[in-house]
Amino acid sequence: MKVLVTSAWPYVNAVPHLGNLIGSILSADVFARYARLKYGKENVVFVSGSDEHGTPIEIEARKRNIEPKKLTDQAHAYDKKLFIDTWKISFDNYSRTESEVHKEFVRNFLVKLEKYIKVEEDEIPYCEKDKLFLPDRFIKGVCPYCGFEDARGDQCDNCGRLLTPRSLVNAKCALCGNPPVFKVTKHWFFDLSEFGDKIRDWISSSSTMPDNVKSVALSWVKEGLRPRSITRDNMWGIPAPFAGAENKTIYVWFEALLGYLSATVEYFKNLGKEEMWKEFWLYNDTKTYYFIGKDNIPFHAVILPAMLMASNEKYNLPSVIAATEYLLYEGQKFSKSRKIGVWIDEADKLMDVEYWRFILIRLRPEEKDTNFTWREALRIVNTELNDDIGNYANRVLSMVKRYYDGVVPSPKEAIFNDEDKNLITLIKESPKRMGELFELGKIKAGSEEILKLARSGNLYLNNRAPWSLVKTNKEEANNVLYISVNSLRTLAIMLYPIMPTYSSNLYQQLGLSNLESETWDSAGSLKIMPGHKIGEIRSLFKKIEMSPEELMKKLDEIRREVEKERPDLLR
């Protein structure tokens, strides 16, 4: 079994905020770490990269009178360092759309779609003031379906409908606010209409695709798929490979979708195993996981599968598209201009990154929009991490140290009572249930299993009271602490995908080394044997002794300093 894990490619014109992070890259990382324990490191590849082409970058470069690549080089390096060094994202390859491997792959791939490519003249919005053909996203207006006043020329963020610049009411240039004119120009179109039935049959028959993804994809098909332009008139992008399209570039959405393939190709090319990428894209025993935000569902559930089908290469179609709803910030949408939210280069200076990783997974908006509040973030850290998990670990290890000189006692299975057996069953079943939920893209739901086990362990200690049993019934005390110590090993493995450093810390306190050598399937086993010596005990987590108001004030101070350090493009 091979597993390909992907996350939506962040566009380099802004530092990702917490909502961006949980919607794609962090969720993908947590799943990838789980998958490596489940299927073996050699069978899992996790790829993503920087999306850096298109008009927004071209415009910023024009303002600064420099080459676009100079801007994106800085932004790509900044984001990559943030993800890998700060947020501990375990990419196998974090690529970029300026990669030569990517550009070559895209051009070769699109040539293969020739049967489904047609050339048409189209009226494209043009801003006479800015002297620029305007991409769909640089046209703003009123959605004709729901009346949303800030709809874009390609899609309404409010109702999710696909739009065209012509369909917008009171369309305006997003740069200067002037109404655009429409100029006739020739463009190349991918004929999506050829794939409606195939997309419907594929998505309907999937037993692993989440309902929200199925709903959006089937709605698109029902409304009727139409040809989509795959070329643009801007200069900053991959030159179109079609005859007669010498002054055109490939629409960023089409080429960015192919980044999942090119990043895999590039990864194995760098390893000197140039053909191995095919095992992850062309072999039947591969599962492919895409972690995205809900606004990207149509591109991943309709356009990408259609492109893969059209290539006739028998590429694997997505197994699971895990699309989150929106994460709000104190009841509002994240907004860079209004400074509403927290950005990932600020968050790490406010509290430990792995605390943030846990907070965001616990708030992951899997079924509906979720509201981030400082009060809830504090509750998650101080109650769930410290009280439920950390306190349980400390209680167990301290008693082993105190009553058994740090040596795990020998159990007597013949006298296990129902409470003993119930916790053993939970130890065995919790990783299994967590894994099953993860495999469906339900990362937050899977994380619940960690807390269920920790809370059950705490309750078990309270009910069995080993501090009393050591005086009255040593054999039963032995059983309680033997089972409890083993539950901590299970907890450490389950916590690892979310908090790799803290879980390894707990693992080491158990007197074990190299958590990454464990397997997920063994997580539910009682593998810590009698006579095993535990390690040095220390508090696993610390409570945050600040109020929400104090945290927000500190964030403002941090923000002023961080903004000075960002590359030009990201300020």
Curated annotation (Swiss-Prot):
Enzyme class: ligase
Entry-linked CDD domains: Anticodon_Ia_Met, MetRS_core
Free-text remark on how the cofactor is bound: Binds 1 zinc ion per subunit.
Top-level division of the source organism's lineage: Archaea
GO cellular component: aminoacyl-tRNA synthetase multienzyme complex; cytosol
UniProt cofactor(s): Zn(2+)
Catalysis: reaction(s): tRNA(Met) + L-methionine + ATP = L-methionyl-tRNA(Met) + AMP + diphosphate
Binding site for Zn(2+): 143, 146, 156, 159
Motif ('HIGH' region): 10-20
GO MF annotation terms: ATP binding; metal ion binding; methionine-tRNA ligase activity
One Pfam family it belongs to: tRNA-synt_1g
Cell location: Cytoplasm
Gene Ontology biological-process entries: methionyl-tRNA aminoacylation
Keyword Disulfide bond attached: no
Keywords: Aminoacyl-tRNA synthetase, ATP-binding, Cytoplasm, Ligase, Metal-binding, Nucleotide-binding, Protein biosynthesis, Zinc
Location of the motif 'KMSKS' region: 333-337
Enzyme Commission no: 6.1.1.10
Function summary: Is required not only for elongation of protein synthesis but also for the initiation of all mRNA translation through initiator tRNA(fMet) aminoacylation.
Family indicated by similarity: Belongs to the class-I aminoacyl-tRNA synthetase family. MetG type 1 subfamily.
Protein name (Swiss-Prot/TrEMBL): Methionine--tRNA ligase
Native organism: Sulfolobus acidocaldarius (strain ATCC 33909 / DSM 639 / JCM 8929 / NBRC 15157 / NCIMB 11770)
Gene from which this protein is expressed: metG
